[in-house]
UniProtKB/Swiss-Prot annotation:
SS bonds (residue pairs): none
Protein name (Swiss-Prot/TrEMBL): Large ribosomal subunit protein bL36
Species whose genome carries this gene: Anaplasma phagocytophilum (strain HZ)
GO BP terms: translation
One annotated Gene Ontology cellular component of this protein: ribosome
HAMAP family named in the record: Ribosomal_bL36
Protein backbone atom coordinates (compact mmCIF):
# COMPACT_ATOMS: atom_id res chain seq x y z
CA UNK A 1 0.00 0.00 0.00
CA UNK A 2 1.30 3.43 -0.93
CA UNK A 3 1.00 6.32 1.49
CA UNK A 4 0.42 9.51 -0.48
CA UNK A 5 -0.20 13.16 0.20
CA UNK A 6 -2.90 13.33 -2.46
CA UNK A 7 -5.02 10.51 -3.83
CA UNK A 8 -5.97 12.23 -7.08
CA UNK A 9 -3.32 10.40 -9.10
CA UNK A 10 -3.94 7.12 -7.24
CA UNK A 11 -7.64 7.21 -8.11
CA UNK A 12 -6.96 7.70 -11.81
CA UNK A 13 -4.49 4.81 -12.11
CA UNK A 14 -7.25 2.27 -12.82
CA UNK A 15 -10.96 2.28 -13.63
CA UNK A 16 -11.87 0.08 -10.68
CA UNK A 17 -10.28 2.29 -8.01
CA UNK A 18 -12.70 3.55 -5.39
CA UNK A 19 -12.21 6.06 -2.58
CA UNK A 20 -13.41 5.07 0.91
CA UNK A 21 -13.12 6.67 4.34
CA UNK A 22 -12.23 4.44 7.27
CA UNK A 23 -11.40 5.61 10.80
CA UNK A 24 -10.77 9.18 9.65
CA UNK A 25 -8.36 8.15 6.89
CA UNK A 26 -8.97 8.18 3.15
CA UNK A 27 -8.13 5.03 1.19
CA UNK A 28 -8.14 4.00 -2.45
CA UNK A 29 -9.16 0.36 -2.82
CA UNK A 30 -9.23 -1.86 -5.88
CA UNK A 31 -10.66 -5.36 -5.58
CA UNK A 32 -9.50 -6.54 -9.01
CA UNK A 33 -5.92 -5.25 -8.72
CA UNK A 34 -4.95 -5.00 -5.04
CA UNK A 35 -1.56 -3.50 -5.91
CA UNK A 36 -3.32 -0.18 -6.54
CA UNK A 37 -4.22 0.25 -2.86
CA UNK A 38 -3.25 3.61 -1.36
CA UNK A 39 -3.78 5.60 1.80
CA UNK A 40 -3.71 9.35 2.29
CA UNK A 41 -1.87 10.69 5.26
CA UNK A 42 0.94 12.96 6.32
Amino acid sequence: MKVMGSLKSAKSRDRDCKIVRRKGRVYVINKKKPRFKARQGY
